[in-house]
Amino acid sequence: MVSAVLLIQKATPETITQFHDQLSNELPTLRGKWNFNFKIFRNNPYSIPQELAETATVAPESKWLYTLSPSYLSDSSISLINGKSVGVFTNLIKEEAGEHGHSVELSIPNSHLHKGATTDLNDPFDFFVAQKLQSLWTQRQLIRGDGGRIYELENGNLTIRTSNVFLHGNFRGLLVQIEINQNLCNVDDVSSFASTFETIRNKYGIPAGDLSCEVLDPKRLDTYADLIYQYSKILNF
């Protein structure tokens, strides 16, 4: 899947209701509700690499760590460090996922579990960073997405997720996450993604806003890496 994230900061209750009504008129398949947590961490400036300890009193540069935990990825989180390195972490065990009806796309294989090849974490990765790595990373912001809805259109080739965005309890806009099948775009030309998503925005009456369809590596598209990269661009308050 290829994604784009749109934030409509000037959204009002009226425009949100109108948008949902318009999507409903397209007779989509409703895939339930969702929410997300997006956390932003900054490196501790006094945590200095050993090789610089004798020449520097603070870290020479600021680094940022982002974590995204959408509810549709059960017990999983995506992390991005400094816009370069991405990791996907899950506590979901494959043999248990099937029993509870969860997707096994992001899960710990049974063989890994039996051989001890896991992170051995009981807590979500973002919680682990906040609680166990305080000497390295300091949480700066927690952005929540609540009241989300999932619409599936065009025979499953298009998914539109909407969510109200809150920072410190204050409404900051309507987030629209658009996901399309790769056969609906030219994956060999990432510069064409913007026009593709703009066409979708106009077709389904999605209000205008700040849109990011940037990818982490144009030569190697990655669903989750590109998604959190787009979140880091859009939810940078």
Swiss-Prot record:
Keywords: Activator, Nucleus, Transcription, Transcription regulation. It holds the Pfam family Med20. It comes from the Eukaryota. This is Mediator of RNA polymerase II transcription subunit 20. The keyword Nucleotidyltransferase does not apply. Its main location: nucleus. Component of the Mediator complex, a coactivator involved in the regulated transcription of nearly all RNA polymerase II-dependent genes. Mediator functions as a bridge to convey information from gene-specific regulatory proteins to the basal RNA polymerase II transcription machinery. Mediator is recruited to promoters by direct interactions with regulatory proteins and serves as a scaffold for the assembly of a functional preinitiation complex with RNA polymerase II and the general transcription factors. Component of the Mediator complex. Disulfide bonds: none annotated. It is found in: Nucleus. GO terms for biological process: regulation of transcription by RNA polymerase II. InterPro entries: Mediator_Med20. GO terms for molecular function: transcription coregulator activity. Belongs to the Mediator complex subunit 20 family. GO terms for cellular component: mediator complex.
